[in-house]
């Protein structure tokens, strides 16, 4: 069951969004579909965010004939102090979570299995990187209507292809994959554009009580956390659409 997100409804959220399954023109039957707004709060560095997003996408696809979903991507930084050289991922996880070699191997096996279940392939992910510039590019892509595609491209680049999501060339390549103007993408990266907007959004979600990701906030009132199976998301969407919450 979804839980209430502490004070989420009180905070001003970003206006940018990528609307999933929005029809060009609604038939009378389609126009009666209830609409749910989903804010997917996540960090590119978070592997469970890749699992959670793919599971959520499956759930949205299952309910698309009955429920209209507006999907917004919101930023969160797991490692805001991470330097430009990054850190070895195994050393980072052992230090941060107190894992031993056996625990780390088991956790990675579980993650790979869960990824396979939702159609996402995890690669090596040899280092942990700073993701602030990735969040800036996701924000910019949202203004162009490509926020969802950019989020997917960055998750793929890091978690599947072991590329640095804070590297300029990787970011430009992701923009190219999303059919965005690469010259404009480079200008955004080099100028520090949208830093203030991203920092504001980060603060909003921290003040709203978000402390871990992925966090899926539905209608700014109901919170589901973690890389849940698609069925959990589907059940929540159907219940909330039915109750009108």
Which residue stretches match the model-derived regions?
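C-terminal cap of thioredoxin/glutaredoxin-like
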Residues: 5, 16-20, 24-28, 33-65, ...
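Structural alpha/beta surface segment adjacent to cysteine/selenocysteine redox centers
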Residues: 53-161
């Amino acid at each position: 069951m979804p839980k209430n997100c502490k004070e989420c409804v009180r905070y001003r959220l970003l206006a940018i969004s990528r609307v999933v399954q929005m029809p060009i023109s609604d038939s009378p039957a389609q126009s009666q579909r209830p609409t749910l707004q989903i804010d997917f709060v996540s960090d590119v560095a978070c592997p469970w965010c890749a699992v959670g997003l793919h599971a959520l996408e499956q759930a949205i696809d299952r309910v698309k004939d009955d429920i209209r979903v507006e999907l917004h991507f919101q930023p969160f930084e797991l490692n805001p102090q991470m330097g430009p050289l990054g850190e070895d991922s195994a050393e980072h996880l052992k230090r941060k979570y107190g894992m031993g070699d056996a625990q780390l191997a088991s956790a990675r096996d579980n993650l790979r299995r869960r990824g396979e279940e939702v159609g996402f392939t995890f690669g090596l992910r040899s280092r942990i990187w700073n993701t602030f510039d990735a969040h800036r590019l996701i924000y910019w892509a949202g203004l162009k209507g490509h926020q969802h595609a950019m989020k997917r491209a960055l998750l793929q680049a890091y978690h599947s292809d072991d590329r640095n999501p804070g590297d300029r060339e990787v970011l430009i390549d992701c923009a190219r994959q999303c059919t965005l103007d690469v010259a404009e993408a480079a200008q955004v990266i080099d100028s520090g554009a949208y830093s203030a907007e991203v920092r504001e959004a980060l603060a909003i979600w921290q003040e709203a009580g978000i402390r871990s990701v992925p966090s899926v906030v539905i209608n700014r009132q109901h919170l589901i956390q973690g890389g849940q199976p698609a069925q959990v998301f589907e059940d929540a969407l159907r219940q909330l659409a039915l109750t009108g919450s």
